[in-house]
């Protein structure tokens, strides 16, 4: 059975939600193709660490001429190496006791003909009061290449993915919304690629505590797709 909250998310999926995490500020376009993953200030030379990527000062990810759209997932699944079935209220990404975790997200965006995707991010809200990870937690992102459904997806029955790429590093503190840059994947959706079935976020179980994020099942805000559209 799909949890009631997941069914509600599916019903809301076509509707833009202007709530939750505050918008990014800045101007320019998305990250350069060779922009590397970062976790904080002081690691990007002359550039800035914004939304998990090193970016030059003139290429920040929220253009002033773009509109911001927030979409909940049409479907989501949390696949934990040592976890149970179903979507929990919160998931601790990177927690060693839970093993590796794969978060599957499918969205139903409709940006209109001719829309230009300036930048796009998956936004995860931290679980209030959860302890911080003991160390930085690396995350990867991949394109989901075949159909899947939360009713049937399990750790042993995962959809096929593209080659994962480094996407973000979760900092120990402060506990702020995490933005994962998925701009190339969302641009592919706009081109109607037939082998696009959502986004997978992968976290290795390598920390004693992990970084806890809300799935929005009974409280808090679950994952959102934040897109800046021209």
Predicted regions located by residue number:
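Sec-dependent bacterial lipoprotein signal peptides
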Residues: 1-26
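Bacterial signal peptide processing site
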Residues: 28-30
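Disulfide-braced loops of extracellular cysteine-rich modules
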Residues: 34-48
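Flexible, small-residue-rich N-terminal segments that precede or flank a structured functional core
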Residues: 53-110, 149, 205-209, 216-222, ...
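Solvent-exposed, acidic/flexible segments
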Residues: 96-101, 113-118, 134, 192
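A short beta-strand element within beta-rich, extracytoplasmic domains
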Residues: 107, 116-130, 225
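Beta-strand-rich interaction/scaffold domains
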Residues: 128-195, 218
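Ser/Thr/Pro-rich, low-complexity mucin-like regions
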Residues: 190-210
């Amino acid at each position: 059975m799909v949890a009631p909250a997941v069914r509600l998310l599916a019903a809301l999926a076509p509707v833009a939600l202007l709530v939750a995490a505050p918008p990014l500020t800045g101007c320019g376009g998305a990250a350069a193709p060779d922009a590397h993953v970062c976790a904080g200030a002081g690691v990007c030379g002359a550039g800035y660490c914004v939304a998990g990527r090193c970016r030059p000062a003139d290429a920040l990810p929220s253009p002033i001429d773009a509109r911001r759209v927030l979409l909940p997932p049409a479907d989501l699944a949390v696949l934990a190496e040592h976890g149970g079935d179903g979507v929990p209220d919160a998931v601790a990404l990177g927690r060693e006791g839970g093993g590796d975790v794969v978060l599957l997200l499918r969205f139903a965006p409709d940006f209109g003909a001719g829309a230009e995707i300036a930048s796009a991010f998956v936004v995860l809200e931290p679980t209030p009061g959860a302890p911080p990870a003991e160390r930085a937690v690396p995350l990867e992102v991949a394109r989901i290449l075949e159909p899947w459904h939360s009713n049937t997806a399990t750790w042993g029955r995962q959809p096929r993915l593209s080659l994962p790429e480094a996407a973000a590093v979760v900092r120990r503190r402060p506990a702020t919304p995490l933005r994962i840059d998925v701009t190339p994947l969302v641009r592919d959706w706009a081109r109607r690629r037939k082998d696009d079935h959502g986004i997978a976020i992968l976290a290795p179980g390598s920390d004693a505590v992990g970084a806890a994020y809300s799935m929005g099942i009974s409280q808090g805000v679950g994952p959102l797709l934040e897109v800046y559209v021209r």
